[in-house]
């Protein structure tokens, strides 16, 4: 059997150097546990950046994949499929929106949101041609495509990729007055993460989302929530916006929408917004394919049937409380909602992630000095306690 060092050597030899993974190869996975080629087991505390909320290889989702793969996998959007309509209905009811537009990856859904907002600004709001603006927040992460990179405040993400998309206005995260000042007659949308993931589990001030939505309503600006990481139970609510009782004009969804099995993403909004598209104005050959839709329907059913949102809330509250009790001045803050938790240190976090790997836990540093804790929501209380004891030992 090929070994870890051989796989890493092949990756380093032939792969583009655009990631810096921990030195581990995962060859098997089930639930919250993964295994390397040598048979060493680790607990997954990253969940593929919250794409595996339902756990690795959930039986119901895998069965849906196999069943659909044995019938039809791809039709393109030139034809209807028997899975797309039911999936539309499922997502529309979940988001309480009238229309859904499917894509594949989160970044594609973000690009779709940008196109939607701009066309809405021109066709509905009557902004002068090519003058539409979009407001975003500092330290955001919306993906790696050109529109998403143009919205980033991280200059390293932009280096060598210019020119950037015009009409992007960046404001401090959670700053209501800055939002008010940034809005002009040309503003199409305010796009934000209700909790910033890559920024280190950055939570806005209480009430900010609600107040920001009110400002956007008053100024006729679309309030767009990127719930790719935070949605579908991760924060202890179905959507992180629910913490402020906010329903955005548009949701951007991805990651756990495919149950950690197959990529699928979408934007969801009402007809007065998504209705700006007509045939040929946007699309994707694989977007909304029957295999992805069948998997996604099963993934959403698992979230509901196994009450994973409620589980995330309960276990997350307990874990945050435990982590806050670790006595070490190196820890500057523990913050999170549900099982979306950041441990901020006053020094680089990567060495501690490597120590946690040696202890049998897989997690990843984010924003340089934050350890992100985001296990699959199916994790048992006993397994989470085991993980906490390992974290405590490393950070104490």
Swiss-Prot record:
Its EC number is 2.6.1.13. The modification N6-(pyridoxal phosphate)lysine is found at residue 255. One of its GO terms (cellular component) is cytoplasm. Transmembrane segments: none annotated. One of its GO terms (biological process) is L-proline biosynthetic process. Keywords: Amino-acid biosynthesis, Aminotransferase, Cytoplasm, Proline biosynthesis, Pyridoxal phosphate, Transferase. It comes from the Bacteria. It is an enzyme of class 2 (transferase). Pfam families: Aminotran_3. The keyword Zinc does not apply. It is found in: Cytoplasm. One of its GO terms (molecular function) is identical protein binding. Pathway: Amino-acid biosynthesis; L-proline biosynthesis; L-glutamate 5-semialdehyde from L-ornithine: step 1/1. InterPro entries: Aminotrans_3, Aminotrans_3_PPA_site, Class-III_PLP-dep_AT, Orn_aminotrans, Ornith_aminotrans_bact, PyrdxlP-dep_Trfase, PyrdxlP-dep_Trfase_major, PyrdxlP-dep_Trfase_small. Its cofactor is pyridoxal 5'-phosphate. It catalyses: a 2-oxocarboxylate + L-ornithine = L-glutamate 5-semialdehyde + an L-alpha-amino acid. Belongs to the class-III pyridoxal-phosphate-dependent aminotransferase family. OAT subfamily. Catalyzes the interconversion of ornithine to glutamate semialdehyde. This is Ornithine aminotransferase. It comes from Bacillus cereus (strain 03BB102).
